[in-house]
Amino acid sequence: MPLIKSINNSTPKILEGVFLADNAVVVGDVIIGKESSVWFNTVIRGDVNSIIIGNSVNIQDGVIVHCTYQKTKTIIGDNVSIGHNAIIHGCEIRNNVLIGMGAIIMDNVIIEENSIIAAGAVLTKGTYVKSGSLFAGVPAKFKRSLFEEEIENSIIKTAENYKKYLSWYN
């Protein structure tokens, strides 16, 4: 059974249709939107600030989502896919974004919609990703604009697939 823990008078709010894996941890000031999925060994820790997760978000195995005390919340839009073992910290990820496996997203990063962050990329503090961009590398840099079919076949398709996987578990 997942660990859902209140802290500092804040209790996580889990909306309808959400899947939480048996060993997922959700703590504190967290909202998880409808039809989202939080997979195995994931920690979402809203103990020092707020974490707001939109609808149809998939947070894959081993991901850590956190924020910074008195400084940065973490806000994740709708239809976002966060790949296995990524670290999401004190940033804003807008709608229809794919975060690759093992990527690290640091404080005050803003990722606009319809963007892809490559596996293993490190977005350092304050990086701004404009809509429709591919960022990769350490530190991550703009590589190119995405093609419409990449948005459809990578970002949208991954989010749709995880909604299907969610149905197998709920």
Segments and roles (model prediction):
Residues 81:
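Short proline/glycine- and basic residue-enriched helix-capping loop/turn segments at helix->loop/beta transitions
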